[in-house]
Regions:
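Extreme N-terminal leader/targeting segments of oxidoreductases
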Residues: 1-24, 42
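Flavin (FAD/FMN) cofactor-binding and adjacent substrate-gating region
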Residues: 1-5, 73-79, 103-117, 122-184
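N-terminal Rossmann-like FAD-binding beta1-loop-alpha1 element of flavoenzymes
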Residues: 22-49
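Glycine-rich FAD pyrophosphate-binding loop
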Residues: 42-62
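Glycine-rich active-site loop/strand segments that organize a redox cofactor
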Residues: 62-92
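A non-catalytic, amphipathic alpha-helix used as a structural packing/dimerization or gating element
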Residues: 85-103, 133
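Active-site substrate-recognition segment that forms the wall
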Residues: 99, 108-115, 202-204, 219-301
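Helical element adjacent to the flavin cofactor pocket in flavoenzyme catalytic cores
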Residues: 137, 162-224
């Protein structure tokens, strides 16, 4: 659905052929790679981005489109394990990552159906108590005042379901169309004179005393620095990272556009939702008012 939805926005880019030189070679054309390229280009550096498939092809273009701060462990767990100093640094980074999305959208005029607000829905009374404690903790420790506690009745009204015990509305969260955002970053990078190449598979990386040589199936880039932004698609390029990857699959379905009556009943304020199940469910409405629903996580080694 995402890919079919952006055919008019998609511009093809050339394969990397022959030899090139730059300051930074970025491998990977998703959110991380494109954002890295934009920041480097803003500093006046010559940048080349190499993507093995199409820009936004990987997880950046296939996710649920939801935007949240914090970390998967929970910032309170980080603080207990590593101390308040590191926890505060990680919290600031997570919040800056959310702010950066809005900054990019404003700066480059990216049209990606961005909406504000997300609900974390509690599937048990115990989880609701955790939400209450976590909200107070974030207000007191990190001065984060975007969290509104919702009782069961309010969650029922916001989600159109009686399944949940309550939840928290995070006004700093949100959702967007991920491939539209990725392609907006591509256009932003291009405006900053970043050289962009698709369908170019990196086969080998040679580190010399003065440079890095990035070899593809049809060409080579000689760069002062390399940024590996490959996510799980890093096989053969960095064994240290590759050995720390565990494949984790999640599944997403998309409905037909909902009727106006159903839209008013389900997510009337257009918030995104995720719940507290270990294999969580997450869902939102698209700009065309389709339900984008994900869950059923699978792991393999």
């Amino acid at each position: 659905y995402y890919a079919q939805n952006i055919e008019t926005l998609k511009k093809p880019y050339d394969q990397l052929i022959d030899n090139h030189e730059c300051d930074i070679c970025v491998v990977g054309g998703g959110f991380s790679g494109l954002s890295t390229a934009i920041e480097a280009a803003k500093k006046g550096l010559k940048v080349i981005v190499i993507e093995q498939n199409l820009f936004g092809w990987g997880a950046s273009g296939r996710n649920g489109g939801q935007i949240w701060n914090d970390v998967s462990w929970g910032i309170d767990v980080i603080e207990k394990k590593y101390g308040i100093k590191l926890a505060r640094q990680i919290w600031d980074i997570s919040q800056a990552s959310v702010d950066l999305i809005d900054d990019r959208i404003r700066e480059f005029g990216i049209e990606c159906d961005k909406k504000n607000g997300g609900i974390s829905a509690a599937t048990s009374a115990a989880k609701l108590r955790e939400y209450e404690e976590n909200r107070e903790y974030k207000i007191k420790t990190y001065n984060y005042n975007n969290l509104e506690l919702l009782d069961k009745n309010n969650v029922d009204k916001e989600i159109g379901s009686s399944l949940y015990y309550g939840g928290v509305l995070d006004k700093g969260a949100g959702h967007l169309h991920p491939i539209k955002y990725a392609l907006g970053l591509v256009k932003a990078a291009e405006k900053l004179n970043v050289k962009l190449y698709e369908r170019s598979v990196v086969t080998k990386i040679n580190q010399t005393s003065h440079a890095v040589e990035v070899l593809t199936d049809r060409g080579m880039v000689k760069a002062k620095k390399i940024a590996l932004c490959c996510n799980a698609y890093i096989k053969g390029l960095n064994l240290g990272i590759e050995n720390r990857i565990m494949p984790c699959a999640t599944y997403i379905v998309c409905t037909e556009p909902l009727s106006q009556n159903l839209q008013r009943e389900i997510l009337p304020n257009d918030y995104c939702v995720s719940d507290t199940n270990f294999d969580l469910n997450y869902y939102r409405l698209s700009d065309s008012k389709r339900m984008i629903f994900g869950g059923a996580v699978g792991y393999s080694l």
